[in-house]
Amino acid sequence: MPNLTANGISLAYEDHGDPSAPPILMIMGLGGQLSLWPDKLVADFVAGGYRVITFDNRDIGLSHQHTDERTPKIVPQIILRRFGIKLKTPYTLRDMADDTIGLIDALKLDHVHIVGISMGGMIGQHVCALVPDKVRSFTGIMTTTGNPKLPRPDSHVMKAMIKRGTPPTGREAIIDASVDMFAIIGTPGEDHHTNGMRERIARSYDRNHSPASTARQMAAIASAGDFRDFTRRITAPTLVLHGSADPLVPIEGGQDIASIVPGARMETIEGMGHDVSDRFMPELTAHMLEHFNAHS
């Protein structure tokens, strides 16, 4: 797997499809490695005539790790953010956006279609605002703007995320715990142990398991606060995809993006939670390919 230097750090990436085809750059969410993207989604984009680039954000997977940095504690991050107190973090969403822009430049891409999921959608909004001339289109999946007036995650999700106790040890137990978390935040009624999610999580674990990295990325999200000033600067054709049953990032987050970006199209995926479920893959893929085709 290749690495390149972007924004002064090493980023791991994968490049799929015809190098001369219009490129799609996919930005993963909190704690997610490039291996968490469903293989079928990538394959369908390639079959649709696109070049697809996935990568590990900084501090995750096989990209640069901030192992020498202090790891923030999750609960204080959440509390401080609610009171509007600025956090000290190893890096910010803006840094991660600059990484993404550096990747675009290092790959010598003139224009890209950006797809960002969850935290990746937050990073994507920053990229669209910072380098509008490089973005053909933007797709934000289950993401938000940091608007403090929006609904918070469901209480049962917050309890699960901040619960104390002895962390699981051993490969299988750690993978099981991660899958169980997706059962809490994901599509209701899905068996995440059999729908492909466990396989992708296991693949990520085997590449590089680093819980501290996830905590540092969460600190970057918390420190961003309200970033609607970036959202307002988006000029790229924008598609917003959001599940009606998302308990982690309520659908109002996607609606906020759609209400701010001129001409944005919002598609509600009925019954989908905070995951990319196989059940909804055809619908998601169709919406995105239609969007790419209209703006390539």
Task: Give the label of every model feature segment.
Residues I9-F83:
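Conserved HGGG/HGGXW glycine-rich cap/lid loop of the alpha/beta-hydrolase fold
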Residues R82, P90, R94-V112:
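Conserved acidic catalytic loop of the alpha/beta-hydrolase fold
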Residues D110-K149:
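Conserved hydrolase catalytic core segment
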Residues F138-P168:
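Flexible "cap/lid" loop of the alpha/beta hydrolase fold
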Residues E172-A215:
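Conserved alpha/beta-hydrolase catalytic His-Asp/Glu region
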Residues I234, V240-H242:
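Short beta-strand/loop motif that positions the catalytic acidic residue
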Residues A245-V249:
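Acidic catalytic loop of the alpha/beta-hydrolase fold
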Residues A264-S296:
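Catalytic active-site module of serine/aspartate enzymes centered on a nucleophile-bearing elbow/loop
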